[in-house]
Amino acid sequence: MQILTDPRTLQQTCLRWRADGQHTVLVPTMGYYHSGHESLMSYARSVGDKVVVSLFVNPTQFGPGEDLAAYPRDLERDAALAEANGADILFTPQPADMFPAGHATWIEVPSLAGTLCGVSRPTHFRGVCTVVMKLFQLAMPRTAVFGQKDWQQLAIIRRMARDLNVPVDVVGRPIVREQDGLAMSSRNIYLSTEERAQAPNIHHGLALGRALVQGGERDAAAVAEAMRRYWRESLPLAQEDYISIVHPETLEPLARITDAALCAVAFRLGKARLIDNMLLAGE
């Protein structure tokens, strides 16, 4: 495995691969790997000829007062895990490499970015879209792999690629969970022992909502209220950011649950902001 830091070197390498007809798969990450990241890399290895894993804590997707400085980092460990999971290149640029002085171009998908996480993080997805598009231009992948835990991010990147005619297949892979149901996240390290004990109830509440829908409940407000009641009792240390039942592609709020519905939630639990989601209907 090569470790590259220079964007131009990455681009030249990937240009050679493309000229040779190689299928490059990109796995964009911010590092501090867990089994969820490893599952993305393993999938990439299974479908591609070449695998590029990017590791970049992107400052443009953090807002004021967020955890940019505190975000966990362990490059040596991450490099070992990337290599063990089949990466051909680990791309680890510095912020000045990706956003040099004078950078003035930003990409946004306002119709999808202004809801859910975008309400409390209004500039987040602008930073995500811009860095992902830059990575697409550098790695020139045929496929890019993202986790479904960040469902809104996945929907936005898919729309960006479709609207801008980007020839990349954007693949979403299932959430990887701890044995007790907590969605794996690099930010779980922020949780205290007591907070960690409560955190799996986020998943359990989502499962409650799905069970209600499977049992015949179709009123989205009723399902959301049942989940909210459960979380009030089971997450006394948490502060609700949002609980929303939306269409999984358009992210538009639903009043009635019919063929496709996603419940997406975010809670602040101590120093951690935890997101999770579950399809209540549809595949």
From Swiss-Prot:
A GO cellular component annotation in the UniProt record: cytosol
Reaction(s) the record says it catalyses: (R)-pantoate + beta-alanine + ATP = (R)-pantothenate + AMP + diphosphate + H(+)
Superkingdom in the source lineage: Bacteria
Molecular function terms, GO-annotated: ATP binding; pantoate-beta-alanine ligase activity
A Pfam match: Pantoate_ligase
Residues annotated as signal peptide: none
UniProt enzyme class: ligase
Gene Ontology BP term (one): pantothenate biosynthetic process
Entry keyword annotation includes Ligase: yes
InterPro entries: Pantoate_ligase, Pantoate_ligase_C, Rossmann-like_a/b/a_fold
SUPFAM superfamilies (alphabetical): Nucleotidylyl transferase
Subcellular localization, as worded in the UniProt entry: Cytoplasm
Binding locations of ATP: 30-37, 147-150, 176, 184-187
Residue numbers annotated as active site: H37 (proton donor)
Documented EC number(s): 6.3.2.1
The keyword tRNA processing is annotated on this UniProt entry: no
Subunit structure: Homodimer.
Family classification: Belongs to the pantothenate synthetase family.
Protein purpose: Catalyzes the condensation of pantoate with beta-alanine in an ATP-dependent reaction via a pantoyl-adenylate intermediate.
PANTHER family: CYTIDYLATE KINASE/PANTOATE-BETA-ALANINE LIGASE, PANTOATE--BETA-ALANINE LIGASE
Record protein name field: Pantothenate synthetase
Source organism (scientific name): Nitratidesulfovibrio vulgaris (strain DSM 19637 / Miyazaki F) (Desulfovibrio vulgaris)
